[in-house]
Amino acid sequence: MSSTAAFYLLSTLGGYLVTSFLLLKYPTLLHQRKKQRFLSKHISHRGGAGENLENTMAAFQHAVKIGTDMLELDCHITKDEQVVVSHDENLKRATGVNVNISDLKYCELPPYLGKLDVSFQRACQCEGKDNRIPLLKEVFEAFPNTPINIDIKVNNNVLIKKVSELVKRYNREHLTVWGNANYEIVEKCYKENSDIPILFSLQRVLLILGLFFTGLLPFVPIREQFFEIPMPSIILKLKEPHTMSRSQKFLIWLSDLLLMRKALFDHLTARGIQVYIWVLNEEQEYKRAFDLGATGVMTDYPTKLRDFLHNFSA
């Protein structure tokens, strides 16, 4: 390569790196900041699955009472096309009955067991008396002013349409975010109702990471408004150490290193995209998330997170 060609190549590369760095720090030079209809620091996962039975009205009422900023819940659809709040399509884990929600009418759904495992807390269970699977419309009616984060659990066109209709009926486009880790589900949600903000699918999260590490992210427009990701390191506390291989531990470490990036979070939040990290249940995890620049934390223990935020901001 001639010295002239090398000079132009290095000049171009240098200009790209400088421009990328500047736009990473100041993205509004190129992109209009997204309007934030609400801001959520405190997010109750399944209503707070460590303090009440998950996805029940009792859980949601408790979370709202202590001041949560957002309820996170999961939706399925019954045989008679009722949108219900439940994490699992198959009810064996939660009710002890090996049936699918989609195979039953709403009136036929069995009640939750009185005690359920807390999915993101090892060797921990939660008890509760409210064991009824609620309808999504009940949640909307009970909490008209509370932001709600809806995980569309199955790729079902009727479910997506019904959820959209309920959001519109209760005038909640400005208080709702929906989507799933599945790319196709998120695309269908956006196509069904683009007025409801969407979250990043797993495929889009991986794309964002690729763009970030290559310096291209500052140049790319983003449609989504909510970047919801796990903190990979918490997997280590959920499993017995001796059951994990060295390669598994390395992959968790590497995933955490790549995903938990303050520069990435700062760039996204500067563009008006909220960053939520799930599912964190310990104070050191809360602190790490907020120190990294996360907008909000999703937890099974809303009371614990409320107390932390009170002390953290004091």
Curated annotation (Swiss-Prot):
Family: Belongs to the glycerophosphoryl diester phosphodiesterase family.
Record text on activity regulation: Lysophospholipase D activity is increased by magnesium and manganese and inhibited by calcium in a concentration dependent manner. Loss of lysophospholipase D activity by addition of EDTA.
Membrane topology: Multi-pass membrane protein
Enzyme type, top EC level: hydrolase
InterPro entries, per database record: GDPD-Related (IPR052271), GP_PDE_dom (IPR030395), PLC-like_Pdiesterase_TIM-brl (IPR017946)
GO molecular function, one term: lysophospholipase activity
Cytoplasmic topological domain: 25-195
UniProt organism field: Homo sapiens (Human)
GO CC annotations, alphabetized: endoplasmic reticulum; endoplasmic reticulum membrane; membrane; perinuclear region of cytoplasm
EC number(s) per entry: 3.1.4.-
Extracellular side: 1-3, 217-314
Spans through the membrane: 4-24, 196-216
Protein name: Lysophospholipase D GDPD1
UniProt main location, coarse: cytoplasm
SUPFAM superfamilies the record matches: PLC-like phosphodiesterases
Tissues where this protein is expressed: Widely expressed with high expression level in testis.
Function of the molecule: Hydrolyzes lysoglycerophospholipids to produce lysophosphatidic acid (LPA) and the corresponding amines. Shows a preference for 1-O-alkyl-sn-glycero-3-phosphocholine (lyso-PAF), lysophosphatidylethanolamine (lyso-PE) and lysophosphatidylcholine (lyso-PC). May be involved in bioactive N-acylethanolamine biosynthesis from both N-acyl-lysoplasmenylethanolamin (N-acyl-lysoPlsEt) and N-acyl-lysophosphatidylethanolamin (N-acyl-lysoPE). In addition, hydrolyzes glycerophospho-N-acylethanolamine to N-acylethanolamine.
GO process annotations (BP): glycerophospholipid catabolic process; N-acylethanolamine metabolic process
Compartment annotation: Cytoplasm; Membrane; Cytoplasm, Perinuclear region; Endoplasmic reticulum
Residues the entry annotates as binding a divalent metal cation: E72, D74, H87
Domain spans labelled GP-PDE: 40-309
